[in-house]
């Protein structure tokens, strides 16, 4: 085969793609669908009565290979109860400049407090705004949830909370 045909064969791929319909994504105006199991931004979850699931054990921070999570636990008191256990996460921060989205923190969490949402639009022009604190990570209160701190549900134990058998707060229903 003559050498000049090698160049023509190489252009065959180019000519073949010239007549295909272009695939254009109009991203900011029309975001495309996101897979249900997509791992995006983290979320700290709550129990049905509004108490936080995070117990401040720091296992997520230890599991993080990028050292992107900082947790500082504190003790619950009867006057100020944020989670059903002895402790809660007083300070919780995720540095999205370091996070690699691996999900090891999710696997390490013993109370299923930390999950990943489908939210992927976290870009910012200020580096400090990409360190998410507990205020940005906590799941919003849904109807029937009381804002912590408040007492555990009457007659409920830590095990009831862990098994998910606690119903929405009676305090929130009264509001």
Swiss-Prot record:
Binds 2 [4Fe-4S] clusters per subunit. Keywords: 4Fe-4S, Cell membrane, Iron, Iron-sulfur, Membrane, Metal-binding, NAD, Quinone, Repeat, Translocase. InterPro entries: 4Fe4S_Fe-S-bd (IPR017896), 4Fe4S_Fe_S_CS (IPR017900), NADH_quinone_OxRdtase_chainI (IPR010226). GO terms for molecular function: 4 iron, 4 sulfur cluster binding; iron ion binding; NADH:ubiquinone reductase (non-electrogenic) activity; quinone binding. Gene3D superfamilies: 3.30.70.3270. One of its GO terms (cellular component) is plasma membrane. It comes from the Bacteria. It catalyses: a quinone + NADH + 5 H(+)(in) = a quinol + NAD(+) + 4 H(+)(out). Its main location: membrane. [4Fe-4S] cluster 2 binds at residues 64, 99, 102, 105. The keyword Transcription regulation does not apply. [4Fe-4S] cluster 1 binds at residues 54, 57, 60, 109. It is a peripheral membrane protein. This is NADH-quinone oxidoreductase subunit I. It comes from Mycolicibacterium gilvum (strain PYR-GCK) (Mycobacterium gilvum (strain PYR-GCK)). It holds the Pfam family Fer4_7. NDH-1 is composed of 14 different subunits. Subunits NuoA, H, J, K, L, M, N constitute the membrane sector of the complex. NDH-1 shuttles electrons from NADH, via FMN and iron-sulfur (Fe-S) centers, to quinones in the respiratory chain. The immediate electron acceptor for the enzyme in this species is believed to be menaquinone. Couples the redox reaction to proton translocation (for every two electrons transferred, four hydrogen ions are translocated across the cytoplasmic membrane), and thus conserves the redox energy in a proton gradient. Residues 148-175 are annotated as: Disordered.
């Amino acid at each position: 085969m003559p050498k000049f045909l090698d160049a023509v064969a190489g252009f065959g791929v180019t000519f073949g793609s010239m007549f295909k319909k272009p695939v254009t994504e109009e991203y900011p105006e029309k975001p495309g669908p996101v897979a249900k199991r997509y791992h995006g931004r983290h979320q700290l979850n709550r129990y049905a009565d509004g108490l936080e699931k995070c117990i401040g054990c720091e296992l997520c921070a230890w599991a993080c290979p990028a050292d992107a999570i900082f947790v500082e636990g504190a003790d619950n008191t009867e006057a100020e109860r944020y989670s059903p256990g002895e402790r809660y996460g007083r300070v919780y921060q995720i540095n999205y400049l370091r996070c690699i989205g691996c999900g090891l923190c999710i696997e390490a969490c013993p109370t299923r407090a930390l999950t990943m949402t489908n939210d992927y639009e976290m870009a910012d022009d200020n580096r400090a705004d990409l360190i998410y604190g507990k205020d940005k990570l906590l799941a919003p209160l849904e109807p029937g949830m009381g804002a912590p701190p408040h007492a555990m549900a009457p007659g409920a134990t830590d095990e009831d909370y862990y098994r998910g058998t606690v119903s929405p707060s009676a305090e929130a229903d009264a509001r």
